[in-house]
Curated annotation (Swiss-Prot):
Record-level GO cellular component terms: cytoplasm
Subunit record text: Tetramer of two alpha and two beta subunits.
GO biological process, any: phenylalanyl-tRNA aminoacylation
Catalytic activity: tRNA(Phe) + L-phenylalanine + ATP = L-phenylalanyl-tRNA(Phe) + AMP + diphosphate + H(+)
Disulphide-bridged cysteine pairs: none
Membership in a protein family: Belongs to the class-II aminoacyl-tRNA synthetase family. Phe-tRNA synthetase alpha subunit type 1 subfamily.
Protein name: Phenylalanine--tRNA ligase alpha subunit
Subcellular location field: Cytoplasm
Amino acid sequence: MVVIEAILDRAKIFIEKAQDLQDLEDLRTNVLGKKGELTTLLKGLGKLSKEQRPKMGEAINQIKVNIQVLLADKKNNLELIALEKRFLAEKIDVSLPGRHAEMGGLHPITITLNRIQSLFVKNSFEVVLGPEIEDNFYNFTALNIPEHHPARAMHDTFYFDKNTVLRTHTSPVQIRTLEKQKPPVRIIAPGRVYRRDLDITHTPMFHQVEGLIVDKHANFAQLKGLLIDFLRAYFEKEVLKVRFRPSYFPFTEPSAEADIECVICSGKGCRVCKKMGWLEVLGCGVVHPNVLSSVNIDSEVYTGLAFGIGIERLAMLRYGVNDLRLFFENDSRFLRQFR
C-alpha cells in the first residue's frame, strides 16, 4: 500500500509542475500506460494471496482513478492557458483600416455586345439565339455555300463528323428563325462562332452579331442608312465617314463591305489602318434568292437584307486594343481597365 500511495504522491507533484500537454502525456504513459507502474502492479496481483488480492486491486484502481482525474483537470487548465496565449498573439487591431472588397466588372466583349444589342433593339430588332453546334444544312447549304466552297474545308472549319460542325457564323440562327417565323422579320443573332485561325487579329473562337431584315419593301439604301446610323452611334461620332465597297459573299447578292474613317488617326494613315486611313468594320448585302428559297420564302415578293459584325473588331477599335488575343488571356491587369 505504501508503494501505491508513493506513486500517487509523485504523480501529484509531477502534474502540478507540468508546463505543457506533452509533460502530462509522459506521466500518463509512465504510470497508466501498458508498461506503466500501476499497470505492472495490476499484472502482479496474481502473486498475492486470495485475501490480499481484492484489497490491493481496489486500492490500485482507486489510485488510477485519482490520477486520471488530476490529469484531466490539469489538461483543461493547460488548454485554457494555451488558448489565452493564442488570443493574445492573434488579436486584431481594430484601428487598422478595413480591406476593401475587390469589385468585379463586365468583360470588354460583353460590354461591346451589350452596347451593340441595345443600339439595334432601339431600332426595333429582336435578339434571337441558336445552337453553336450545327449541321451542314444550316451552316452551309441553306446559306447558298456550295460543297466545293473553301469555307467547308477542314482547315477552315471544326468538324465533329462529316455532317456536324462548330458554327462558323451566326447566320444559321437566321435560317432557323425564318423556318418558324414568316416575314416581316427584323432580327439580330449574337453569339460565339468558331474558325481554325489564330494570330494577332484572329482567334479560333470569336463573337459575331449578324442582322437580318426580310420585308416586302426592303432595299439596299435602307440597309446602308441603318448601318451608317449604327456606326456613328456606336463610336459616338455625329460625323463619321463611312464607305461601302463591292464585295462577295455566297449568301448575299449584291454584297458589300463597310469601312469607316480610321478612328485612331482620323483618316491620316497610321499603323492600325495600315496607312490607308480606312478600317473595315462589317460585311452586308441583299440576301441571295437561293437563301430565301431554302426556307420557302418567295424572293419575288420579299427582299432580305443582311449584315455581319465582328464584336472583337469593334471592341479593339473602340478601346485601342492592338492584339485580339488579349481579350481571352484573362489577365486582370488588362481587364481592370474596363471597369
